[in-house]
Each structure stands twice: as structure tokens, then as C-alpha cells.
């Protein structure tokens, strides 16, 4: 009997959703950074075995939106929980149950599919804190399974995957065996560059950063030539991104090139320009150009 289904991963920003997905897949398909709200698009990732296929939807964190981009991210996350076969609610034992957690759980209240509580980052917590967190969440919601894990170290992730397989309904193989994602190569490239920018800049520049790929082509010997605009919202941010004598931008480029060559398995020539687009996160036309398309309301 072949089993297949759709799995969505939800939780507050920065609880480790993308890290978990990347560990399961063994591929860097979803942007990972220490800043919240780094995932901006739903990414369908396909895990296929001999007798199963699970299609994961990696979502932005659900939060109170502050701008048009924030509204897109929240609507995208909510939309992803519709018509799925399993929901993984990811949280952190060292944080109290907040309004954000309760808001997410309330949106899951009427789901007919199973909801797993996945307690991440247990390696950074204490046994008492983990036990207290499990008790608190058990009172808030009736979970089909409760699994403590460490996504970054892979602890108990194999147990989680086995439980997920069991939860999948009987179904067809939706995608070919060798297909691991439904996103275009350019999207992954832009996400890698954005991650490196966020990591390099740390808290110096907020989330008003986007990557627009101007050109991406491969020559006859296999080398990729990639030109991108790194978009920010303020002139002051542009100066920070470039850095003294261009050193910060150079570091972003070097880190991006290394990761891109691993992903593309080829040599990469990368050129990055920094452009200011004031209040781009509230510009619906520019958001569409950058690939952020709002989900249709059902």
C-alpha cells in the first residue's frame, strides 16, 4: 500500500521550521537565519520513499502583520493549513505559551487532520522545562502525537518522520521519485543570497531586504553568471550593506558564492548591486515583481 499526503509546518517565527525541513530533506531548500520571519514563501518539498511520499509546505511564521509583506506572509501561512493531511505545530520549550501560540492553535482547532506537537530545541533546555512545556501545551490542545526534538542536531527527527509516515493516508505518487522541490532554481538562489545578507548584517538592518535576480545564465563550460539587486528601504541601510570600503558587501558576496556553488554544483560568478526602493514592503506592484503573490481568499 502506497501512502502519500501533504504536511504543513506552523509555529511562531524563528522556532526552527526551516531548519527541521532542511534536516529531513538533507538539502538547503528553505532559508535559515537567526532572524524571525526569514521564510517568506510557501515551499513545497517532496520526500519520497519506497512506499510513501510526503509533500511538505514550509511556511512563514504566523504573526501580527505590520506591512503589506507581513500580510502576505501571514495569509500564506494560514492558507497552507487548508486541505492538508498533517500539521506539525513547532514550538520552543524555553518560551511561555504566548498570544501568538494561542492564535495559531485556535486556527487549527477545527482541523480534521492530525496535529503533532513538535517541541524543538530541547537540547538547549532542561528536562524540567521540557516537561512543564509539554504539560502546558497538552492542556491547550489535543495533539495526536507529541515529539521532543532538536532539529539542528537531528535528535529524534527520525522518530518524528516515522510517526508522520504512519499518519499519511493511502494515496498516489504526486511527483516523480527524483523531484525534491517545486520551486524554481532562481528562487533558491535568491533565498541563499538573502540568508547570507541577513546573517552578515545581523541586527544592523531590519527585514526590509529582498533579492531581485537580474540575470542568471550558464556558459558552455558550466559556469553560472549571476547578477542581482539587493533591495533595501533606506539610503542609510544601503551604506550599512555596502560597508566601509565595500567590505560588508564583499563578505555577503563571498559567503553567497560559496553556498551557491555547493547548491548549483558548479563555479559561480556573482555580482551584487545595492538598490534603494523606499517602503518596498508596502508596494504591492513591487512585491509581485519580487515573487510575493498573495493567496486567493477562499
Swiss-Prot record:
Residues 201-278 form the KH type-2 domain. Signal peptide: none annotated. Gene3D superfamilies: 3.30.300.20, P-loop containing nucleotide triphosphate hydrolases. GO terms for cellular component: cytosol; plasma membrane. CDD domains: Era, KH-II_Era. Disulfide bonds: none annotated. One of its GO terms (biological process) is ribosomal small subunit assembly. An essential GTPase that binds both GDP and GTP, with rapid nucleotide exchange. Plays a role in 16S rRNA processing and 30S ribosomal subunit biogenesis and possibly also in cell cycle regulation and energy metabolism. This is GTPase Era. It comes from Clostridium beijerinckii (strain ATCC 51743 / NCIMB 8052) (Clostridium acetobutylicum).
